[in-house]
Design a protein with these regions (language model features):
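Membrane-interface extramembranous regions at the lipid-water interface
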Residues: 2-37, 53-86, 117-138
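Residue-level marker of motif borders
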Residues: 24, 36, 42, 88-89, ...
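Structural signature of transmembrane alpha-helix termini at the membrane-water interface
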Residues: 26, 91, 103-110, 123
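Residue-level detector of functionally special positions within alpha-helical transmembrane segments
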Residues: 29-30, 47, 94, 111
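Short hydrophobic membrane-inserting alpha-helices and related fusion/pore-forming segments
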Residues: 42-51, 99-117
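Loop-to-transmembrane boundary segments
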Residues: 79-102
Length: 138
């Protein structure tokens, strides 16, 4: 009998993730973050040049609404184009979005009950630095 290769822990969406997502929407401002990213994405998609950036805003909006139980990883086939768009994104908006999420994360981390939400803001911050070439995973 061949031994199975261990592939790491399998993370499934749990009831805790569901409960934390509900609390995130109500207390953590998840609905506001989602609306901000949706509005920015819609405005960016009005121009041909802004469409790739608008699509990234839509990705961030989805994660902004229900961040618990979701993660992101490098997309297969992400290459030079993703790198170039990430550099442009970083210079134009990425740094400011990152700083806003870090400030919110630190503020939430100061309260005991806000620590799980602080981790989500730090996750947003990392994704906001370079969203191109990343894909969301459950």
């Amino acid at each position: 009998m061949a031994a199975r290769k261990w592939e790491g822990p399998v993370r499934r969406r749990s009831r805790v993730d569901f409960l934390l997502n509900i609390l995130w929407i109500i207390l953590g401002g998840g609905w506001l973050i989602c609306l901000e990213y949706l509005a920015a994405g819609a405005l960016l998609c009005l121009t041909v040049v802004g469409i790739p950036f608008g699509l990234q805003c839509f990705k961030l909006a989805k994660l902004g609404l229900v961040p618990f139980g979701h993660d992101f990883d490098d997309a297969p086939g992400a290459g030079v184009g993703s790198f170039a768009l990430n550099v442009l994104w970083l210079v134009v908006a990425g740094v400011w979005i990152f700083l806003s999420h870090v400030v919110l994360g630190v503020g939430l981390a100061l309260t005991i009950i806000g620590i799980p939400f602080a981790f989500q803001h730090l996750k947003f911050g990392m994704l906001a630095l370079a969203p191109f070439g990343k894909e969301l995973q459950r």
